[in-house]
Amino acid sequence: MLTAEDKKLIQAIWDKVQGHQEDFGAEALQRMFITYPTTKTYFPHFDLSPGSDQVRSHGKKVVNALGNAVKSMDNLSQALSELSNLHAYNLRVDPVNFKLLSQCFQVVLAVHLGKEYTPEVHSAFDKFLSAVAAVLAEKYR
């Protein structure tokens, strides 16, 4: 459960993500593809080379979806319902991949935000992204 302080930290850091959605998202996806190469199987029609338009576009979609989740921290299930349906029923993405991408996104935040990505921010974001991953996996049950 996110505390009021967690929510405050998440919102403050998210304000710094604004304007960098495409870059941060593409970098997180690239890190995931390199670190967990089996995740590439969900993107057979993509040019997965670094900086490709498809990876950048999808990265932006991912980060924008996280932005919507930040705006709806108190009602993640409703905010992510359509996305959960899409990944569970249409794309059939193994839910473990949500956690893998979450880890990669946190690395991107730490790299770009440096000292601002404090242990407290890391903890808050970890809880938030774990909650997002859990909601996205709800439809699999």
UniProtKB/Swiss-Prot annotation:
Tissue: Red blood cells.
GO terms of biological process kind: hydrogen peroxide catabolic process
Family: Belongs to the globin family.
All residue ranges annotated as the Globin domain in the record: 1-141
The entry's keywords: Heme, Iron, Metal-binding, Oxygen transport, Transport
Annotated function: Involved in oxygen transport from the lung to the various peripheral tissues.
Subunit relationships: Heterotetramer of two alpha-D chains and two beta chains.
Name of this chain's protein: Hemoglobin subunit alpha-D
Binding positions for heme b per the UniProt entry: 58, 87
Lineage of producing organism: Eukaryota, Metazoa, Chordata, Craniata, Vertebrata
Coiled-coil blocks: none
InterPro entries documented for this protein: Globin (IPR000971), Globin-like_sf (IPR009050), Globin/Proto (IPR012292), Hemoglobin_a-typ (IPR002338), Hemoglobin_oxygen_transport (IPR050056)
UniProt key word Heme: yes
